[in-house]
Amino acid sequence: MRAVQYRTIGSEPEVVEVPTPDPGPGQVRLRVSAAGLCHSDSFVMGLPEEQYVYGLPLTLGHEGAGVVDALGEGVTGVEVGEPMAVYGPWGCGLCHACAKGAENYCPRAAELGIAPPGLGAPGALAEYMIVDDVRHLVPLGDLDPVATVSLTDAGLTPYHAIVSSLDALPAGSTAVVIGAGGLGHVASRSCGRSPAPPSSRWT
């Protein structure tokens, strides 16, 4: 299969041929329909060698969506052919942080060798990717993977900020989004669906 990999510190990413991965026990293989690019991809490739911790070569892409293509042993709850988005923060799934839905704060991920897609594990800038657990798949139903893939990160970030602030935003209050770039636009639209109407300040 083809994949976009960062292969040498300081170099441009390359489109290369790599073996198509097989899902192991508990894993799901996704045929990628869409992958998003993020500032984090640029950040990772801009790190100097002494700060780079992700391993090489690295298949990029932590925003991914596609169709379930193959199931590893013991996988239940999903079917081959189902369209899914990939939830990017991966943790152990067992600790207090993971139980609260905060897998990005999992204290055991590093010691267990768990890394998010595109930020350690092979990511979505490939024809196929492995998702380590079905809990990291979000059913898309009739939604278009291309139209929704950026919600897995660029949408999730402002959504989390808004949901975390709802106690301070009673009905009739006003939310101000400062910096209405890509994530700011998502925040404004998300605020419009929350109890507080949006007000944007362009900076």
Region spans (language model):
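N-terminal Rossmann-fold NAD(P) dinucleotide-binding loop
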Residues: G184-H185
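Conserved S-adenosyl-L-methionine
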Residues: R193-P198
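Short Gly/Pro-enriched turn/cap motifs at secondary-structure boundaries
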Residues: P19-T20, G55-G61, P116-A121, Y128
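Glycine-rich beta-strand-centered segment in the early N-terminal region that forms part
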Residues: P21-A35, E49-A99, G141-L143
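Cytochrome P450 core scaffold surrounding the K-helix E-X-X-R motif
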Residues: S40-G46
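Conserved acidic E/D residue at the C-terminus of a beta-strand in Rossmann-like folds
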Residues: T203
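NAD(P)H dinucleotide-binding glycine-rich loop of Rossmann-like/cofactor-binding domains
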Residues: L94-I178
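Conserved hydrophobic helix-helix packing surfaces used for dimerization/oligomerization
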Residues: A3, T174-A175, S199
